[in-house]
Amino acid sequence: MVRLRKPLPPYTLKTPEGGKIYLPDLKGRALVLLKDEALAQALSARAAELKALGAQAYLLAQAPRPSPLPLLLDLEGALLPALPEGGALVADAFLEVYHLGSVSGEEEVLDWLRFVEAQCPECVLPEADWF
């Protein structure tokens, strides 16, 4: 089950070519998962911004289809039901889910990625420095 502020479950998805993608192997970059093709198209047009934010976006589907973003197949329906239509899942580089819900467009997805980037553990004072 996908939950906010929890690590993304260790699901295995497929590529259209038959390869397997184990979600924990995607650690190291912020992650965006979508199921809305129009949102995927809008986000793919802003690929340079995604790259600058160190993020990777994927379109999820149950069957192969043309996609403006890399396509991942959720054949077992493990993740697709968790994503709302027109919504997104945004996770940090450690795959902690920060957003799972509706978005008003690609700009809001990018805003979530900027927020996630600002949450890095190195960006805050160590606890000892608070006193």
Regions picked out by a protein language model, each given a short descriptive name:
Residues M1-F131:
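Chalcogenol-based redox active-site neighborhoods
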